[in-house]
C-alpha cells in the first residue's frame, strides 16, 4: 500500500486549521501530520518530522508567510501550497509567493472561509497531491544582468469557441508565426525563465497560465519589467504582433482570431473548460482554426489535462507542437497527457524552449 502524503497545515485561524484537516484527511491518500498557528511553531514541527507538502497562509503573526516560504526554499525545499485570503490589492504578494517557490495558490474568501473550503474539497486535495510530486527547481535570480541570452463536469472548448467558418483564408500561410503557450502549476517561474531569454523582436506570443482573476495583471507587469519583449495582460481586440506577449486575464477565456493578415485576441466570458477559465484548450483550438500552420503550440508544466486535446488539434491543423519534458516540469500532468495523445512533434527541456521558439517562429 503506498505511503500517504504527509501534510503540515500552517494558518493562524484555528477554524481553518480544523476545516483543512477534515478536508485533507477525507482523502485516503493524505495524512495531516500536524498544524501550526505561525511559522515559528511550524519550523519546530518540521524539525520533528518533515512533511511532503505544507499548506501555508500568508497573513500570520510573528512572521509573514512569504518570509517563511523563502526560508523553507533556501534551507530545506518542501512543496508549498499557499492557501490565503489574498485580494486583488494583494496581487503583488501572490507574485512574490510564486517567485519564492510556491507550487500553487488557493484563494480563500475573507468571509465564509470554512464553507468555501468544504465546497472546494476535491480541488484542494488534487492540488496537494500534485504538489507532493512536484519537482522543486532552483530558479536563477530575476534580473537583466544575469539572465541567459539566446541569439467540475468537464466541458470541451466547443462550449466557448464559435462554429468553424468555411473558407481557406483563415488557414492561409502568412509570413508571421504565432507562439501559443499553455501552463499551469509551476508555470509562473518557468514562463519567466523562457521569456527572459527572448530578445525584443521575438515572434508574437499568446499565453494561458492558470491563475486567479486580477493576479494576471500583476504577473504580466512583473514579466514586462524583466523581459525585453512587451508583456501585458490581454484585453479584447489586442493585436498579436512580433515583440509582444499577451497573457490571458484570470477568469476569462482568450481566443486567437484573424482578420486578413492580422491576428488579434478575443477575451470573453464562458463556462469552465477542462475545469479552467482561462482554458488552454480554448486558446489552442482557436489557434488551430485561425492560424493552422502559422502557429506553434507549446504545452508546459501543470497538473491535469487542459490543453492536451487542443494541442492535438493544432498539430492536425499543421502547427508545430512542443511538450515540456518530465525532468524539467514541476508537475508532469498536462505535457504527459499531450504526449500520450500523440499531440507533440517534439519533447524538450525547459532550457531549450526559448531557442526553439526563435527557431520555429522565424522559420
UniProtKB/Swiss-Prot annotation:
GO terms for molecular function: phosphorelay response regulator activity; protein-glutamate methylesterase activity; protein-glutamine glutaminase activity. GO terms for cellular component: cytoplasm. Residues 172-363 form the CheB-type methylesterase domain. Gene3D superfamilies: 3.40.50.2300, Methylesterase CheB, C-terminal domain. Its EC number is 3.1.1.61, 3.5.1.44. Involved in chemotaxis. Part of a chemotaxis signal transduction system that modulates chemotaxis in response to various stimuli. Catalyzes the demethylation of specific methylglutamate residues introduced into the chemoreceptors (methyl-accepting chemotaxis proteins or MCP) by CheR. Also mediates the irreversible deamidation of specific glutamine residues to glutamic acid. Belongs to the CheB family. This is Protein-glutamate methylesterase/protein-glutamine glutaminase 2. It comes from Rhodospirillum rubrum (strain ATCC 11170 / ATH 1.1.1 / DSM 467 / LMG 4362 / NCIMB 8255 / S1). The lineage of its organism: Bacteria, Pseudomonadati, Pseudomonadota, Alphaproteobacteria, Rhodospirillales.
